[in-house]
Each structure stands twice: as C-alpha cells, then as structure tokens.
Amino acid sequence: MSVTSVVVGIDVAKAHVDVSVLGCPSSIAQRFDNEAEAHSALAAALKPLDVALVVMEATGGYEAALACALQAAGLPVAVVNPRQARDFAKSMGRLAKTDRIDARMLAEFAGVLVRRDDLASFIRPLADAQQQALAAMVTRRRQLVTMMLSERQRLQLAIAIVRPSIEAMIEAIGQQLDDVEAQMVGHVQAHYAELNKLLRSAAGIGPVASATLIAELPELGRLNRREIAALVGVAPMANDSGNSKGRRRVQGGRFEIRRVLYMATLTAARHNPAIKAFYDRLLAAGKLPKVALVACMRKLLTTLNAMVRTNKPWDKSLHGA
C-alpha cells in the first residue's frame, strides 16, 4: 500500500451506515441509509476512488447486503470480527465510541490491513445468490436446533399441565428441522454437487458439515494451510515473551465453522483411518485428548482445503496419518 492508498471504514447499524474515507485529498465522512438503493449509491461513489480496502464489522447480518453490493461493484471488502476492531481501537487510544468515530477507526484499521502479506485471508469471496440462500438455510437449521434443545430442557422440568404444549412444540420444531434439512440437501445437490461430493469423500464430513463449509467458508481452497487454520481458529498461537515460552493456544476464528468441524472430527476419529491413526499417535505421545482432538480438527481442515484447491477427493495414500 502506498501512502496515498484510499481506505474505507463503514460502521453498520440496522437503519443506516456511517462511512469514513481516508487517503483522499480530504477525508470524507458521510451517512447512508442501510437499504439497497443507498448501497448502490455508495458503491457508485466509492468506485472512482481506486479503493484499496473497505472494512466493516460483522453485525449479525445487517452488513451482508452492503458487503455483497460493494463486492459486486468490484470493491475489496473485509468483514472483520468486532472484537478485532475494538481491540485495534483500544490499542490506538480510541476509547470514545460513536458511529462516526467507529467508521473512522475502521478506516484506520483498513489502512493497517492493506499492508499485511495475508490480506487475502481477510477478504471473503463474493457470495452469489445460491450461496446466500444456502447460508440462510444453514442459519435457520442452527436456530431450530437451538430451539429444540431449549424445549427439551424445559420439558425435563415441566409439570403435567404444560407438558402437552412443550411436546407439541418439540414435534413442530422437529418437522421444521426435517423440512429445512431436506431443502438444504436439495439446494446443495442442485448447485454444489461436485464440491459436495468432494468434501464428503472424507469420512466424517456429512451433509450438514458439507453445507456449512460451502456456505460459511468460501475461502476453502483459496488460502494456504496456515491461513485457513488461523481463519477458522484452530491454529496454535505463540505466547512467548523474552526467555519465557508460554503455552500455545487456539483462539478467535469462525465459531460456527469450528463447532461443525469439531463434530465432524469426533466422527472422523472413529471412522476415518488417517484421522484415527493421527489421534491415537498423539495420545500415545502423551497429548491430552482435547489437544489431540484440536490437532485432528486442524489436520482435517487443512486436508479439505488441499482437496478443494486441487479438486481431488480424499485419497488415503496422500492424506494418511
């Protein structure tokens, strides 16, 4: 990045977005409505500026349509974890918090990110209509699973008079789960049949794991093994200072992907010979079961990443322990 590179920070709220542009002859701060027509207007305003990077926080979905609109206009967009952005603000002494200040801070954060060699790991590929639909189905299934768990917990403590109501709700949620899962599987088969077949060639990856990876980890196959492990949050991070060597820890990353990968690895540790052998070898070396399982998660993820990058299915001769 040159000193004159243009970077943009966008603070996203439900009704509006605040935009801060740095690197122009004079900085720009402006507010737009958070709706499709305003998204197009913002993209049109930014496109002539030769923007190096646009940064916004993940806000539970309020940022999704804007990010897609800007990416579709050819602008590089990074949607970052809010904790990363807030930690950056604190490190810069920015303790005050308003929408306008946050937008400026995100623009400054963008100015740092564009200098990084691993910038590609921050920029999520553009989600097309099929991927957005699949992501919505994956999210809905996750919501239904959470609702089912809550109702089952209520049932354990319920007195007789309310049990029929809870049981009826459990039955209704179960039917909705079946419907959404069938819809999800059908969508994957219609639009991602080859990629799904590739992913599911690895023992441990079932239909839910495959759909989640396709929907929520579009970087799979585009990054190197270290970048993909760090992105998901299964890469051990150093914690050293001077002569002190701290314990390596995994932290950050995409929680939902990590949760799905955890469940897939539990299955793989029993039914995938390569992962099972790797897990057993780590236990024999004295590793704690949880440490060994995280290492297996990392191995499974990086193997899937290589499979997608090379477009080759699981091969025990290549992906052995």
Q: How would you name each of these model-derived features?
A:
Residues 207, 212-285, 289, 316-321:
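Phosphate-backbone recognition surface of nucleic-acid-processing proteins
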Residues 71, 78-203, 211:
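Long, charge-rich intrinsically disordered scaffolds of nucleic-acid metabolism proteins
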Residues 14, 60, 84, 215:
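Short, glycine/acidic-enriched loop or turn micro-motifs at the edges of active sites
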Residues 284-321:
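Basic, amphipathic alpha-helical segments enriched in Lys/Arg and hydrophobic/aromatic residues
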Residues 2-22, 106, 212:
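Gly/Thr-rich phosphate-binding beta-strand-loop-beta motif of the actin/hexokinase/Hsp70
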